Amino acid sequence: MKTFASLLYLKMSSAATAAATATAATATATAAISVPKRLNYIGSKFQLLDWITSTMNTKTGLFDRGRDGSTGSARSSGSSVVTFADIFAGTGIVSYHFRTKYGAKVISNDAELYSSIITHAFTCSVYNNKCKSVIAMLCAELEAKRYVSGVGVGFVTRNYSPYEGNERMFFTVDNAQRIDYVRKRLEEFKVQSGDGGGGVGLSDDEYKFILASILISADNVSNVPAVYGCYLKKFKAKAIRPFIIEPIHKHTKPCVAGSRTYCSDVLSSAFLSDAAFAGTDITYIDPPYNERQYSKNYFPLNIIAKPPQQLVSMSEAPVLKGKTGIPVDCFISPFCKRGGGVCEAAFDKLFRELKTKWIFLSYNSESILPKEKMLEIMGRYGVASVEECDYKRFKSFKYNGDLEIKEYLFCLRKS
C-alpha cells in the first residue's frame, strides 16, 4: 500500500517548503480577497457584496477597514470578532466574503445538501496540501481514462446523461462517467490508509472542500440554460468540455474558532434553539424571492453531493419522476409559498425566534411579499428600515421584460 506522502504529485524540499510558507504569509491579504469559483445561481449576491457590506456597516458600525486599507477587520465591542450568521447561504459567497475579508466568525446554513457542502468549504475549509494532492490525483486518473469500461457508470450516468438510450441530457455520457468516478474515488480516499480501502484519510473539512470543488466543476459542464428545471436538446459548447476538478478556492488561512455550517430547515425548533446563535451580532437572510423551489432547480447537484453508496441502497436511493428525473422528496420551502399567509407566517416566526442583535434581509421589488408588508412584519420585533438599489434581473438566455428591478436590503434592530 502506497503512503499518502508517496502519492503526492507536488513534492517540495525543506528549503522550498520554508520559502513557500514565507511567501504565503506575505500574501495573506491577496489570497483572502481572491475570487473563488461559484455556481451560476439564481439570486447570487456576488455583485452586491460591497453594497450589502457598506449598508450593514452604516447601520451597525461593526465593520471597519484595516489600517493598511487592504483588508477589513470585524469587531463587535472592543477588539472582539463579529459573529455573522448566513442562514440561507446558497452559493456560500457571502459567508466566504465575511470570513476572508472581515475575519468574522461565520455560522452558515442552507437546507439544500449541495449548498451546505459548498458553504462549508467557504466557511470552514482551507486549501491545504492534501486537498491539492487529492484533486491532482483525481484529475490524473481522469486524464488516464480510468473511468471507462464501465468503472465510471453510476447513478448520474444512468439517470442524467443519454447513456444506453436515456433521453436526459443534463451531462454528456463522458462527463457523467467522470463525475460518477470521482465521487466513488473520493469516498475511497476519505478513509484512513490503514483501513484497507486505499484511502489517505481526509478530515471533514478536507472532504467537503474536495466535494464542493467537484460540485462546482460539475455545474460548469452542465447542459442547462441556467438552472436544472430542464436540459437543452443539444449539447452546448460548455457542456462538451471535459469535466475536470478545479479547487473551489485557494484560501489558506484557518477560519475563526467556532465557525460552523449546518444543513437545516431554518424554521426547525432544533435550528432556532441552537446555542451557537445566541448573541449573534448579525444574521443575514437571503431567502427565496418567489415560488421557484431551489430543491427543484438544482436537484442533480444534490444527487452528486450524496455518497454513491446511498444512491444504490434500496432504502436510501432517491425515487425519480418525470421527464427530468427530479426526486420525489424535494424539500419544499414555505418561503416560496404565495397566498394563504404561509410566507408571512414563516418570516414572522423567523424574526421572532432568531437570537441575534441585527437582522438584514435581501429581497426585491418582484418578491412574494411587498416592501410594506415586510417592514410591517419586521416592525413587530424592533426598529425596521430598508435600503434600495437598482439591479439587473436574473436571466437564463433572453427575457422580454424590464431589465432592472429594485433590490432591497431590510434591516431590523431587535428590541
Model segments located where?
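S-adenosyl-L-methionine
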Residues: 2-15, 29-64, 82-85
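Intrinsically disordered, low-complexity terminal tails and inter-domain linkers enriched
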Residues: 14-32, 62-80, 191-200
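Class I S-adenosyl-L-methionine-dependent methyltransferase module
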Residues: 105-107, 111-251, 295-341, 345-346
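Conserved acidic residues
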Residues: 265
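Short conserved loop adjoining the S-adenosyl-L-methionine
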Residues: 268-277
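Conserved Class I SAM-dependent methyltransferase catalytic core
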Residues: 329-381
